[in-house]
Amino acid sequence: IYRLCDEYGLYMIDETNMESHGSWDTAHATGDYDYIVPNNKPEWLDMMLDRANSMYQWDKNHPSILIWSCGNESYGGKDIYEMSQFFRREDPTRLVHYEGVFHDRSYNDTSDMESQMYPTVEAIKEFLAKDRSKPFICCEYTHAMGNSCGAMHKYTDLTDTEPLYQGGFI
């Protein structure tokens, strides 16, 4: 798919294989956020950077990659922030994305854009009415769950009226 995107001029977010939202359940149930991984755990950092480097080295020559992503649904914290810094050092020409800062603002500079999953169009408008510091991208905004892709036009219509709304990814 990378070669096809390169050939046809389609943009991609290349996302590190990191997802740990299962660790959130215990944290939310108990209020003890030490359960969340990788978060700020030094023992995870080398593994996280190795994973980022492996993806970067494998994919760095694909012009279709517009954005590096630090992973999916892994909360936030210093370890993921360090991943974002790795991408910035290695490739300052591309943007860095991470949705998890929405849940943990302590490392808000991890992502070059505001990114949320499945917000309503009204929630996007409300957010951008208060915070215009970064462009807004829906890293996931529709699939066959919930309203089964209904009202998708409301998201695409928003790109006509809100210059900081950059669309999204399905």
Regions from the PLM with identified roles:
Residues 1-170:
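Substrate-binding/catalytic cleft of secreted carbohydrate-active enzymes
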